[in-house]
A protein has these predicted regions:
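Short solvent-exposed coil/turn linkers within tandem alpha-helical repeat scaffolds
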Residues: 97-104, 118, 133-142, 169-179, ...
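N-terminal positive-inside, membrane-proximal cytosolic segments immediately preceding the first
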Residues: 2-40
Length: 227
């Protein structure tokens, strides 16, 4: 049986309507503030959307220029052409025209590789260092860049700084796939520094990290030779 509605309940104001009335009264008395806040919110949305579209277009153009440089370099390599400053300039143009882009970051990495191949290890170190300023921690290229800097210092016979670079690679947060290579690099530097104990320690770490049977045999031979 349905509950009988009392006269008091009928005459009682509708609570929802009362809330609407209060909201309407607030809006009427605070129009200027509401318009200001709404305008700011809309402006923020427009700016955010505009910035997002701008960055998308910016990155797309940068990537296009980077792709041209990369494809040109690959074609030259297939044709047996030697590296030259023109190849490096193409990547340099990406950095100059689109600083802060992902393509510019990768251009530093490619330039590091190219300078090393050309024998300009100081320029190679500078390029890799710029790359490391931008690359995220999760990227395996970070480990490769640290190792590459280590090779540069090793080529300069600066063993302490080479060791530091290889240790930076070993301490990076990613790059488990390059762990064995990094340990071998550290071990080799310790061996060159005549620190046999540390060399053995890291050759053993490299051995424990490798899944390649031929590399495993090679490392065992080195370890037995040092012992």
């Amino acid at each position: 049986m349905a509950r009988k509605i009392t006269k008091k309940e009928i005459e009682k104001p509708d609570s929802f309507q009362a809330v609407l009335n209060k909201v309407g009264a607030y809006i009427s008395s605070n129009k200027s503030k509401i318009y200001l806040v709404s305008g700011i919110a809309i402006l923020i949305i427009i700016i955010s959307a505009g910035w997002y579209l701008y960055r998308m277009n910016y990155e797309e153009k940068a990537q296009r220029l980077y792709a041209i440089a990369h494809i040109t370099g690959m074609k030259s390599a297939r044709q047996g052409a030697t590296l030259d400053q023109n190849s490096i300039k193409m990547y340099s143009d990406v950095i100059t025209q689109y600083p802060g882009s992902k393509a510019a970051m990768m251009s530093y990495y490619q330039m590091g590789n190219m300078y090393y191949d050309l024998g300009d290890v100081d320029a190679s170190i500078n390029a890799y260092t710029e790359f490391l300023k931008e690359v995220p921690d999760g990227s395996e290229l970070k480990i490769l860049a640290y190792n590459s800097i280590g090779y540069c210092y090793e080529k300069k016979a600066d063993l302490p700084r080479a060791l530091e670079s290889f240790e930076n690679a070993a301490n990076a947060k990613s790059g488990k796939g390059f762990e064995g290579m990094t340990y071998r690099n550290i071990a080799r530097i310790y061996e060159e520094m005549n620190n046999k104990d540390k060399a053995l320690e890291y050759y053993q770490k490299a051995l424990n990290s490798t899944a390649d049977p031929s590399m495993g045999l090679f490392l065992k031979k080195i370890i037995s030779t040092i012992n």
